[in-house]
Amino acid sequence: MFTAVSVSTRGCATTRPISLARGARSNARARAAPRAMANVDEQKVVVVGGSGFVGSRVCARLRERGCAVTSVSKSGASVEGASSAIGVDLADAASARDALRDAFAGAECVVSCVGVIGTDDAKMRAGNGDYNVVVVEAAKAAGVRRFVYVSVASVVPDVVGGVAMKGYFEGKTMAEDAIRANFDANEYVIVKPSFIYGGDAFSLTPPRVTKTYGDALAKVLGSGPVKALAAKAPGPIALTLAEPVSVDDVAGACVAGALGMTDGESVVDGTDEIKAFAKKL
């Protein structure tokens, strides 16, 4: 079952570098002119998991870029920045496929922030794997041109995948495999964060710290000496010393991918790559 709300259409601006005469380039750099807005098209983007921690921020950032945003979630709750909200239960695969195909009609990109953590392996495998496979296949069937997915940094399963949360990592792998099977490398972006922080509240499930605390932690763990130590440390220690990533940077990377600002990149793995990718906006 799903409930649809009408979608309003707004133009979504993408960007490209400005071509400058050779003699004027240094002056343009000195002025630090903003990137020019170009290729203005009416662009619909659907965010699955749009009411969640990451998804809600993706919706807001897309709206800032002028996109017509549809949020899909189990509850169908309205989300700031989304011009429509649709309720879809991904656990009911048959009805979800039909609902998603309708929701994805006319969309330029689908962003999946769907993920489940803190339950048993079977539920985590389904919530991260099966649910996303349904989303990917529905996007392909609807003729969506680009797909963005929030997965997990490769360093995390490499360290703890055989010890805990096996179903979580298996599900993430299922989702990534489905994306690669249905979309070409220049049609998708997989964003792979480790520990995401942000917001105003602490949480245990999923584990999360506030923006203030996370910014301070990122400043320490992102310093040169700590990064150098982490690079030489064995897996568990390296993961402990890994710099966390702000939810705003994760959302920014998703939006850059959704708008096709990829420069040929299809996998954005870890905090450094995510921060650099988010700066494309």
Which residues are covered by each model-predicted region?
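Glycine-/Pro-rich loop/turn segments that contact NAD(P) or position catalytic residues
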Residues: V116, D121-K219
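N-terminal chloroplast transit peptides
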Residues: M1-A28
